[in-house]
Amino acid sequence: MKGSRTITATPEGSPEAVDLSLIGLPPPMSQRPGSASATRSIFRSMSVATGSEPRKKALEATGPGGPRAINNLRRSNSTTQVNQSWTGSPRPAEPTDFLMLFEGSTSGRRRVASLSKASSEKEATWNVLDEQPRGLALPASAQSPSTLDSALGPRRKECPLAPSFTANNRSNKGAVGNCVTTMVHNHYASSKMVSPPKSSNQTAPSLNNIVKAAAREGGEGSDLGKPRKNLSSASQSARGTTGLLRRREVTEEEAERFIHQVNQAAVTIQRWYRCQVQRRRAGAAALEHLLASKREGQRQRLGGGNLLELHRQEEAARKKAREEKARQARQAAIQVLQQKRAQKASEAEHRRPKDRPETRAPEQPRPMQEPGCVTHPKANNAGASIYPTGPADPCPPASESSPEQWQSPEDKPQDIHSQGEARQDLAVSGSSRGKARARATLDDLLDTLKLLEEEPEPLPHPKAYHKDRYAWTDEEEDANSLTADNLEKFGKLSAAPGPPDDGTLLSEAKLQSIMTFLDEMEKSGQERPAPWRESLVLEAGSGSEGSTSVMRLKLELEEKKQAMALLQRALAQQRDLTVRRVKETEKELTRQLRQQKEQYEATIQRHLSFIDQLIEDKKVLSEKCEAVVAELKHGDQRCRERVAQMQEQHELEIKKLKELMSATEKIRREKWINEKTKKIKEITVRGLEPEIQKLIAKHKQEVRRLRGLHEAELQQREEQAAQRHLRQAEELRQHLDREREVLGQQERERAQQRFEQHLEQEQRALEQQRRRLYNEVAEEKERLGQQAARQRAELEELRQQLEESSAALTRALRAEFERSREEQERRHQMELKALKDQLEAERQAWVASCAKKEEAWLLTRERELKEEIRKGRDQEIELVIHRLEADMTLAKEESERAAESRVKRVRDKYETELSELEQSERKLQERCSELKGRLGEAEGEKERLQSLVRQKEKELEDLRAVNTQMCSERASLAQVVRQEFAEQLAASQEETQRVKVELAELQARQQVELDEVHRRVKTALARKEAAVNSLRKQHEAAVKRADHLEELLEQHKGSSLSSK
């Protein structure tokens, strides 16, 4: 920090030569006191303020002009000569960089404010060396800008130093260095101190003392209460020496070194301050970024948390009530503690001996120190102290650090500083140490309780948990019922208990800090001497209260643990019950599924007999529907074309009607113009200009009215034509829709009738087949019973014959069946191919894709159904065979059971195969006949549809003929109308030409008449102007005459009055 210095050169004989500032650079060699010029006085500018309140003692002690600096200077300045007179002229200006340091931070503002208050309370300045108050009155011109801006700022004074110096005064240099470093470190603990350059007359011990003092003060960290350790030694050395200040000399190099040290200290302070400001800004920016990210995350998390909003509101209300109760309890505890403290203080004051000596050397008892807390006694820089220094102050107990857990980082240095100042006051005033220590202990306890009583600062972004560990104490009434919501809630609490929220009840950290503080107070009270034993009663009371709260919290914790265990057991029971219910439900659902499966299988078996017929009918109906849809689309397309033609014709008609209306309107307009021109001629004959103007306005108004009427009428005609056209188109569309609906309804009815007839036939055939099978089975049973006796005798013969005949017959039947099946398949494939070719030729492109998809699905479904039917038929046949075998075995019984059963199985096998072949042949024949019948029906339907198409085409031709006839008639009518309009148009054009000629003549005549009227008006105006001028002249003459008469009257009056 390099500033400007102010040098005032005075004559040689003057003792005031140079004015050096703390913030300036050392003067050059040509202007120093050791040069050829006369001796000059060196002024040192300091800001000193005093106050009388105990609150400001610490600030005065740490300032550059406080008692500590004074003691250090008094101890070592035995030969300093301070005999210069007070000049009363301070520096004219000083940069505000050094004051900005104190105004930039909160602690600096507090110090400046306290100094301002002190200076306002007691207006006095102190000399640095002799401590005598002197009045200080700074002129307005000598005040700096900082003092002008802030009326409450600290005042400055000038202390002249002695002009003569000695060469070997080493203790003074050490004392000055100690004063500067103490002044700097009492306010700011810097970690770097640059030593000044050595001079020729500087010895190593003094420089080492300065460096050691700076290093020791920097090593003590942020504990700002430690620099007061040298106070007792300084005060004792000052008492040991003579009370009067001795004359001593300060060398030029020591003054330069002092200025350099102050400059270096100011630079270090500003660097430290800027570093702290930058660090604070970076931390604030990082915190803001973190808060923004947390806020965004919380907003995203809380976006879907509306389901538990009501529950959270209830929890917040309960939490608020609980906090209010805790706050009231803490306030009551604080009030009780304050009462006890006041009572104990009064009792201690009464019991303290009144004749206690106050001037004895302060001896501090050694309280119990914490392990790891080391004291650093300060070195004696001057080496002139003859009395032993007292022990350094102990480290602050845990009670001083426990409230810092709830303090902000900005308040901690100020609190530590205030505690250090309090300890310094205890060291200085030994007589009131016991009372002050007890009060400090009680103040710390009161501050701790106040911090606990204060409302906690809400976190900027709460974590994922929003409930504290004790939040469910108020919910015991709601949580007694084992509902699903309560079980889920208690399960979440037991599974992942979140950390407690700050401020609801006493957290574990707060409780631990309070207990540590109480333990430390008990230990320090046990080793404290008798005069301070009485102040421990309040601590014991607070310890009992703390232990009571701990026991209460432990009991609550045990209760909550028991409740949690009970809820966990209930939750396990509920889970077992849920598992059992799930298993029972699964069994019930499995049973229902099995029943439904059986019902569905029975339903499928009932409906399988009708699926083949329905599939075929669906194919036929789909083909017919496709044909009908194609026909309807074709008809719809033709109708759209017809509508488009009719729209074009209507547009032509509307256009012709517009032309006709325009021609008619033109003719009518011409007639109206002729009539109006005649009327105008009659009016212009009269030669009245106002009437002409009125007629022209009326004519324009009439033209506008007629134009509006014409436009309205034309628009109305267009709307009527458009409505008529739309009405005709709507009628045609409705007619087509009705026809299409009628045709579709008829087709649907016929298809429904055919389907019902076919269904009835199939049902009758199925019933007949069922009865026939039952009859055949009964006859077969009877025949087998009759033949049983004969077969017993002829068993051996028939066995071989039956085997041979059955083998031959089987081969013959199988060959015949194969040939017949191949022939039937071939014929069937040919017929199907012919039908498919015919149908594919008639379909459209878009119908083909849909039909292919449908056909593929139907074919797959047909194969599946056929397979299922074949399986079911095989099962039925097997059941019949088993029943027949059982009957045969019962009839044969004993001796021939094996042979009869073998013959029976062979015979039944061949008979069943034969019956199957016969049934399949009959089915194929029936299917072939059915297909032939359907083909005939399809051909008949095709013929009917073709006839219907021919009928529709004939009707269409008739309609076209009628349309052409109407068009021809319309064209002839339009031609006649067009010819008439042409004749009328020619006549109207001739009339228009004639009217135009007459109008031109009328306009020329009107112009002449207007000119005549204009000339007459001009002459009338000229006559009027002449008359007005003559009248004006007469008026002026009359005015002059009246003025003359008034003057004469005045003269006459004056003469009459003078004569009287």
From Swiss-Prot:
One of its GO terms (cellular component) is centriole. This is Centrosomal protein of 131 kDa. Transient cell cultured-based knock-down (by RNAi) of CEP131 leads to a reduction in ciliogenesis. However, chronic absence of CEP131 following genetic deletion (knockout) shows that cilia develop and function normally in vivo. This suggests that CEP131 is not essential for ciliogenesis, except for the modified cilia of the developing sperm flagella, and that there is an alternative mechanism to compensate for the lack of CEP131. Induction: By 5-azacytidine. InterPro entries: CEP131 (IPR030465). It is found in: Cytoplasm, Cytoskeleton, Microtubule organizing center, Centrosome; Cytoplasm, Cytoskeleton, Microtubule organizing center, Centrosome, Centriolar satellite; Cytoplasm, Cytoskeleton, Microtubule organizing center, Centrosome, Centriole; Cytoplasm, Cytoskeleton, Cilium basal body. The modification Phosphoserine is found at residues 14, 35, 47, 78, 89, 105, 114, 146, 150, 481. It comes from Mus musculus. Disruption phenotype: Females grow normally and are healthy. Males display developing sperm flagella abnormalities resulting in infertility. Post-meiotic defects during spermatogenesis with abnormal morphology of elongating and elongated spermatids, including teratozoospermia, premature apoptosis, but without increase in DNA damage. Sperm are immotile with shortened and morphologically abnormal flagella, and altered intraflagellar transport (IFT) and/or intramanchette (IMT) trafficking. Displays normal postnatal multiciliated airway epithelium. Lacks retinal degeneration and kidney cysts formations. Belongs to the CEP131 family. Residues 217-226, 314-327, 344-363, 409-424 have a biased composition (Basic and acidic residues). Residues 1-96, 136-155, 217-248, 314-437 are annotated as: Disordered. The keyword Nucleotide-binding does not apply. Residues 1-244 are annotated as: Interaction with PLK4. Localized to the pre-acrosome region of round and elongated spermatids in testis but also present in ovary, brain and adipose tissue. One of its GO terms (biological process) is spermatogenesis.
